[in-house]
Protein backbone atom coordinates (compact mmCIF):
# COMPACT_ATOMS: atom_id res chain seq x y z
CA UNK A 1 0.00 0.00 0.00
CA UNK A 2 1.43 3.34 -1.03
CA UNK A 3 1.67 5.86 1.83
CA UNK A 4 0.33 8.50 -0.55
CA UNK A 5 -2.84 6.60 -1.36
CA UNK A 6 -3.68 4.28 1.48
CA UNK A 7 -6.60 1.97 0.78
CA UNK A 8 -7.25 -0.06 3.94
CA UNK A 9 -9.16 -2.65 1.93
CA UNK A 10 -6.00 -3.42 -0.04
CA UNK A 11 -4.27 -4.72 3.09
CA UNK A 12 -3.49 -8.43 3.11
CA UNK A 13 -2.33 -9.03 6.69
CA UNK A 14 -3.95 -6.93 9.38
CA UNK A 15 -3.18 -6.43 13.05
CA UNK A 16 -5.91 -4.99 15.28
CA UNK A 17 -5.07 -3.79 18.79
CA UNK A 18 -8.05 -3.39 21.13
CA UNK A 19 -7.50 -1.97 24.63
CA UNK A 20 -10.66 -3.77 25.83
CA UNK A 21 -13.08 -6.33 24.46
CA UNK A 22 -15.59 -4.21 22.50
CA UNK A 23 -13.03 -1.69 21.18
CA UNK A 24 -12.41 -3.99 18.21
CA UNK A 25 -16.05 -3.51 17.27
CA UNK A 26 -16.60 0.11 18.25
CA UNK A 27 -13.40 1.32 16.64
CA UNK A 28 -12.98 -0.79 13.53
CA UNK A 29 -15.68 -3.45 13.36
CA UNK A 30 -16.96 -2.33 10.00
CA UNK A 31 -13.50 -2.39 8.45
CA UNK A 32 -12.81 -5.80 9.99
CA UNK A 33 -15.99 -7.18 8.43
CA UNK A 34 -15.11 -5.77 5.02
CA UNK A 35 -11.59 -7.18 5.21
CA UNK A 36 -12.90 -10.60 6.22
CA UNK A 37 -15.29 -10.58 3.26
CA UNK A 38 -12.21 -10.13 1.07
CA UNK A 39 -10.43 -13.09 2.64
CA UNK A 40 -7.71 -11.11 4.42
CA UNK A 41 -5.60 -12.38 7.31
CA UNK A 42 -6.41 -10.83 10.70
CA UNK A 43 -4.96 -11.11 14.18
CA UNK A 44 -6.66 -9.24 17.02
CA UNK A 45 -4.85 -8.47 20.26
CA UNK A 46 -6.97 -7.62 23.30
CA UNK A 47 -4.80 -5.83 25.82
CA UNK A 48 -6.82 -5.75 29.05
CA UNK A 49 -9.25 -8.15 30.66
CA UNK A 50 -12.14 -5.66 30.67
CA UNK A 51 -12.82 -6.64 34.26
CA UNK A 52 -13.26 -3.15 35.73
CA UNK A 53 -16.63 -2.31 34.22
CA UNK A 54 -18.69 -3.73 37.11
CA UNK A 55 -16.49 -3.27 40.16
CA UNK A 56 -19.30 -3.66 42.71
CA UNK A 57 -21.05 -6.66 41.20
CA UNK A 58 -21.30 -9.57 43.61
CA UNK A 59 -22.60 -12.08 41.09
CA UNK A 60 -19.91 -11.19 38.56
CA UNK A 61 -16.58 -10.89 40.40
CA UNK A 62 -13.69 -9.79 38.28
CA UNK A 63 -12.42 -13.22 37.13
CA UNK A 64 -15.91 -14.28 36.04
CA UNK A 65 -16.54 -10.96 34.31
CA UNK A 66 -13.21 -11.12 32.49
CA UNK A 67 -14.06 -14.59 31.19
CA UNK A 68 -17.45 -13.32 30.02
CA UNK A 69 -15.84 -10.44 28.19
CA UNK A 70 -13.53 -12.80 26.33
CA UNK A 71 -16.54 -14.86 25.32
CA UNK A 72 -18.31 -11.72 24.13
CA UNK A 73 -15.25 -10.74 22.10
CA UNK A 74 -15.23 -14.13 20.40
CA UNK A 75 -18.93 -13.78 19.57
CA UNK A 76 -18.33 -10.29 18.20
CA UNK A 77 -15.49 -11.45 15.97
CA UNK A 78 -17.71 -14.22 14.65
CA UNK A 79 -20.40 -11.66 13.82
CA UNK A 80 -17.78 -9.73 11.87
CA UNK A 81 -16.81 -12.80 9.87
CA UNK A 82 -13.61 -13.28 11.86
CA UNK A 83 -14.70 -16.21 13.99
CA UNK A 84 -11.82 -18.36 12.79
CA UNK A 85 -9.18 -15.63 12.86
CA UNK A 86 -6.48 -15.81 15.53
CA UNK A 87 -6.68 -13.58 18.56
CA UNK A 88 -4.54 -13.02 21.63
CA UNK A 89 -5.81 -12.01 25.07
CA UNK A 90 -3.05 -10.41 27.13
CA UNK A 91 -5.37 -10.12 30.17
CA UNK A 92 -3.70 -7.02 31.56
CA UNK A 93 -5.66 -5.30 34.35
CA UNK A 94 -8.41 -3.07 33.01
CA UNK A 95 -7.76 0.62 33.81
CA UNK A 96 -4.41 -0.29 35.35
CA UNK A 97 -2.05 -1.44 32.62
CA UNK A 98 1.51 -1.98 33.85
CA UNK A 99 3.83 0.98 33.67
CA UNK A 100 6.12 1.24 30.68
CA UNK A 101 9.38 -0.59 31.24
CA UNK A 102 8.08 -2.77 34.08
CA UNK A 103 8.54 -6.53 33.91
CA UNK A 104 4.82 -7.03 33.20
CA UNK A 105 4.90 -4.38 30.47
CA UNK A 106 7.96 -5.93 28.82
CA UNK A 107 6.34 -9.37 28.94
CA UNK A 108 3.21 -8.00 27.25
CA UNK A 109 5.27 -6.15 24.65
CA UNK A 110 7.22 -9.29 23.85
CA UNK A 111 4.00 -11.22 23.21
CA UNK A 112 2.93 -8.52 20.77
CA UNK A 113 6.37 -8.65 19.15
CA UNK A 114 5.93 -12.38 18.56
CA UNK A 115 2.50 -11.86 17.01
CA UNK A 116 3.80 -9.10 14.77
CA UNK A 117 6.85 -11.11 13.73
CA UNK A 118 4.68 -14.07 12.72
CA UNK A 119 1.97 -12.02 11.01
CA UNK A 120 4.15 -9.42 9.27
CA UNK A 121 1.17 -7.06 8.96
CA UNK A 122 0.97 -4.53 6.18
CA UNK A 123 -1.74 -2.68 8.14
CA UNK A 124 -1.95 -2.13 11.90
CA UNK A 125 -5.09 -0.64 13.44
CA UNK A 126 -4.37 0.95 16.82
CA UNK A 127 -6.23 3.13 19.31
CA UNK A 128 -5.76 6.87 18.85
CA UNK A 129 -2.58 7.95 20.60
CA UNK A 130 -4.36 10.55 22.75
CA UNK A 131 -7.77 8.95 23.18
CA UNK A 132 -8.92 10.07 26.65
CA UNK A 133 -8.70 6.69 28.35
CA UNK A 134 -5.52 5.51 30.03
CA UNK A 135 -5.66 2.03 28.48
CA UNK A 136 -6.05 3.44 24.98
CA UNK A 137 -3.02 5.70 25.33
CA UNK A 138 -0.93 3.05 27.06
CA UNK A 139 -2.03 0.51 24.46
CA UNK A 140 -0.91 2.76 21.61
CA UNK A 141 2.54 3.14 23.18
CA UNK A 142 2.89 -0.58 23.80
CA UNK A 143 1.88 -1.45 20.25
CA UNK A 144 4.21 1.14 18.73
CA UNK A 145 7.12 -0.16 20.79
CA UNK A 146 6.37 -3.73 19.75
CA UNK A 147 6.30 -2.76 16.08
CA UNK A 148 9.59 -0.89 16.47
CA UNK A 149 11.32 -3.79 18.21
CA UNK A 150 9.97 -6.26 15.65
CA UNK A 151 11.28 -4.02 12.86
CA UNK A 152 7.96 -4.27 11.08
CA UNK A 153 6.72 -1.11 9.41
CA UNK A 154 3.06 -1.45 8.38
CA UNK A 155 0.75 1.35 7.48
CA UNK A 156 -0.94 2.45 10.71
CA UNK A 157 -4.50 3.62 11.20
CA UNK A 158 -5.68 4.95 14.56
CA UNK A 159 -9.27 4.97 15.77
CA UNK A 160 -10.72 7.13 18.55
CA UNK A 161 -13.50 5.95 20.83
CA UNK A 162 -13.82 8.64 23.50
CA UNK A 163 -12.23 11.68 21.90
CA UNK A 164 -15.43 13.36 20.74
CA UNK A 165 -17.13 12.94 24.11
CA UNK A 166 -14.33 13.32 26.63
CA UNK A 167 -11.38 14.82 24.80
CA UNK A 168 -9.63 18.02 25.86
CA UNK A 169 -8.45 20.36 23.08
CA UNK A 170 -4.91 19.01 23.33
CA UNK A 171 -6.14 15.45 22.75
CA UNK A 172 -7.28 16.19 19.20
CA UNK A 173 -4.89 15.96 16.24
CA UNK A 174 -2.60 18.91 15.73
CA UNK A 175 -2.54 20.65 12.38
CA UNK A 176 -0.56 18.52 9.96
CA UNK A 177 -0.09 15.70 12.47
CA UNK A 178 -2.34 13.17 10.79
CA UNK A 179 -4.48 12.61 7.73
CA UNK A 180 -8.10 11.54 8.01
CA UNK A 181 -9.08 8.26 6.38
CA UNK A 182 -12.81 7.65 5.99
CA UNK A 183 -13.88 4.06 5.35
CA UNK A 184 -17.32 3.32 3.94
CA UNK A 185 -18.75 0.50 6.03
CA UNK A 186 -22.27 0.62 4.66
CA UNK A 187 -21.85 -2.97 3.33
CA UNK A 188 -20.96 -4.17 6.83
CA UNK A 189 -22.71 -1.80 9.23
CA UNK A 190 -25.31 -4.40 10.20
CA UNK A 191 -22.56 -6.89 10.98
CA UNK A 192 -20.92 -4.25 13.17
CA UNK A 193 -24.16 -3.63 15.04
CA UNK A 194 -24.65 -7.35 15.55
CA UNK A 195 -21.10 -7.63 16.84
CA UNK A 196 -21.68 -4.82 19.31
CA UNK A 197 -24.83 -6.54 20.56
CA UNK A 198 -22.63 -9.51 21.47
CA UNK A 199 -21.01 -7.29 24.09
CA UNK A 200 -24.14 -7.44 26.18
CA UNK A 201 -22.34 -6.77 29.47
CA UNK A 202 -21.47 -3.32 28.12
CA UNK A 203 -24.68 -2.47 26.29
CA UNK A 204 -27.51 -3.90 28.42
CA UNK A 205 -28.51 -4.62 32.02
CA UNK A 206 -27.35 -8.21 31.66
CA UNK A 207 -25.36 -7.63 34.86
CA UNK A 208 -27.86 -5.90 37.10
CA UNK A 209 -26.36 -5.82 40.58
CA UNK A 210 -24.01 -2.85 40.24
CA UNK A 211 -25.75 0.53 39.95
CA UNK A 212 -22.39 2.23 39.37
CA UNK A 213 -21.41 -0.02 36.46
CA UNK A 214 -20.18 1.24 33.12
CA UNK A 215 -22.59 1.01 30.23
CA UNK A 216 -22.30 2.37 26.72
CA UNK A 217 -24.76 5.20 26.20
CA UNK A 218 -27.16 5.03 23.25
CA UNK A 219 -25.63 8.24 21.89
CA UNK A 220 -22.16 6.70 21.95
CA UNK A 221 -23.39 3.58 20.20
CA UNK A 222 -25.18 5.64 17.54
CA UNK A 223 -22.09 7.78 16.96
CA UNK A 224 -19.86 4.76 16.43
CA UNK A 225 -22.18 2.58 14.36
CA UNK A 226 -22.88 4.82 11.41
CA UNK A 227 -22.03 4.07 7.79
CA UNK A 228 -18.51 5.52 7.95
CA UNK A 229 -15.54 4.84 10.19
CA UNK A 230 -12.96 7.57 10.74
CA UNK A 231 -9.29 6.74 11.14
CA UNK A 232 -6.14 8.81 11.32
CA UNK A 233 -2.74 8.02 9.96
CA UNK A 234 0.42 9.95 10.63
CA UNK A 235 1.22 12.49 7.93
CA UNK A 236 4.21 11.52 5.85
Where are these predicted regions, by residue range?
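Metal-dependent de-N-acetylase/amidase catalytic core
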Residues: 1-17, 38, 60-65, 78-88, ...
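ATP-dependent adenylation/pyrophosphate-handling site
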Residues: 3, 10-21, 25-64
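Generic detector of contiguous secondary-structure segments
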Residues: 24-33, 76, 182, 232-234
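Generic hydrophobic, amphipathic alpha-helix propensity
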Residues: 69-73
Amino acid sequence: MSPAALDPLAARRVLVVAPHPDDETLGCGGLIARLMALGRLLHTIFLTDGGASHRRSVSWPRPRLAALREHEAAEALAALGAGDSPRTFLRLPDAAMPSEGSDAWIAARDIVINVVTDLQPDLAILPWRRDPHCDHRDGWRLAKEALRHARVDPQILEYAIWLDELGAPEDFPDSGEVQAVHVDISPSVEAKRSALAAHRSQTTDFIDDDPTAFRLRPATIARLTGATELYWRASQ
